[in-house]
A protein has these predicted regions:
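Short helix-perturbing small/polar motifs within transmembrane alpha-helices
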Residues: 11, 25-31, 112-157
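Alpha-helical transmembrane segments of integral membrane proteins
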Residues: 21-33, 67, 71, 86-91, ...
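Transmembrane helix-loop junctions in multi-pass membrane proteins
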Residues: 43-51, 85, 98-106, 152-160
Length: 213
């Protein structure tokens, strides 16, 4: 009779050493992701956002919040790649800093927005103990980011003249955007990067290997 031993690889992975044990590679990777996405922000701000925003504002101003999900991407991607407390915040703030330095219409206000957006992701990651990059978790992170950004900042700074009904429509649009772009889009982007082998040092990469068997 032959005995066989199988090793089961956990399909949800914690960061190496536990969530709080930051490594140099974590910091460097988070910063690189933030810079890359900050440059992407700048391109979006310069080339696409003006036309998209003008179109949505002409139709109905609260619809402009359908663009919010673009700016929440760094928090979701950084947080779910590195999976340590502060990773989402660091990636988002680096991206916002690059965007501000390259030039945008909001100036340093993007730093406040970035912090609020990242806070939503950080809270959801903490609730799930920084374990597992499931689509539902990414979507929840996007939803909470949208709520914090709109209710704590945009309603008062950019949408002060809106009626309550318009503010609620803007909030709904922001939530939809963050579900689709930063939630689903961020989840898909991390999975795509993991499939290349570039994230093998991180939980997302190890989860990809586990899915492959």
């Amino acid at each position: 009779m032959t005995a066989t031993t199988s090793t089961t690889i956990p399909r949800t992975q914690l960061a190496v050493g536990g969530p709080v044990a930051w490594r140099s590679v974590d910091l460097v990777t988070t910063a690189i992701l933030g810079v890359a996405l900050g440059v992407a922000f700048w391109g979006w701000d310069l080339l696409l956002y003006p036309a998209v925003s003008a179109l949505l504002n002409t139709a109905f101003p609260p619809l402009a919040s359908l663009t919010l999900g673009v700016w929440v991407l760094p928090a979701v991607v950084g947080g779910f790649v590195v999976r340590r407390p502060g990773a989402a915040l660091l990636c988002e703030i680096v991206a916002a800093t690059v965007e501000a330095l390259l030039g945008n219409q909001w100036g340093l206000n993007v730093m406040i927005s970035g912090a609020l957006q990242a806070l939503g992701v950080e809270i959801i990651l903490a609730v799930f103990l920084w374990r597992g990059f499931r689509l539902g978790v990414a979507v929840l992170a996007g939803v909470l980011s949208a709520i914090l950004e709109l209710c704590c900042w945009e309603w008062w700074v950019y949408q002060g003249e809106y009626t309550l009904g318009m503010k609620l429509v803007a909030l709904g649009c922001a939530v939809v955007s963050c579900i689709a772009i930063s939630g689903l889009g961020g989840w898909a982007l991390v999975r795509a990067m993991a499939a290349t082998g570039a994230l093998n040092a991180f939980p997302a990469g190890r989860e990809h290997l586990a899915r492959r068997g």
